[in-house]
A protein has these predicted regions:
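Active-site acidic-Proline motif in GNAT/NAT acetyltransferases
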Residues: 83-89, 120-121
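Acetyl-CoA-dependent GNAT
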Residues: 2-5, 10-78, 83-85, 102-109
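Conserved beta-strand-loop-alpha-helix junction that forms the acyl-donor binding cleft
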Residues: 113-121
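Conserved acetyl-CoA pyrophosphate-binding loop and the N-cap/start of the following alpha-helix
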Residues: 86, 90-98
Length: 121
């Protein structure tokens, strides 16, 4: 999945440590969980979710996880973040477009509903 030089790559044993180095700008920690927590959730919900690194060329600049809620049914976009050093350049919008394109393939089930989540505190 690539648009311009931004792409989504599945988080695997080969790249998960890169996600641990991502940082939010000051004050943003209240709106999104760090990838460490998200990857723990991805393990628990592994049959209904897919975590991705957001890459600019070959450098991870962000993280997003897609999870399918079988009860509703709907797709949720969890923990989307762009590293503080890459914010303000339009990469988040491109990554969101790529994430929605992935969801449209209906990897876990059928639904036309997508929710983008964030912490409200």
């Amino acid at each position: 999945m690539e648009k311009y030089n931004i792409s989504l790559r599945q988080i695997t044993e080969d790249n998960f440590m890169e996600a641990f180095h991502l940082k939010l700008a000051n004050g943003q920690e209240h709106f999104v969980s760090h990838p460490i927590r998200s990857l723990a959730q991805a393990y628990v919900y592994r049959n209904q979710c897919q975590p991705f690194g957001i890459y600019k060329d070959d450098t991870m600049i962000g993280y997003v996880m897609v999870i399918y809620d079988y009860d509703i049914p709907e797709y949720d976009i969890w923990h989307m973040m762009i590293d503080e050093s890459n914010q303000g350049q339009g990469y988040g919008g491109i990554a969101l477009d790529l994430t929605i394109a992935y969801i449209k393939t209906k990897p876990f089930g059928t639904s036309d509903k997508v929710t983008l989540t964030c912490h409200t505190d």
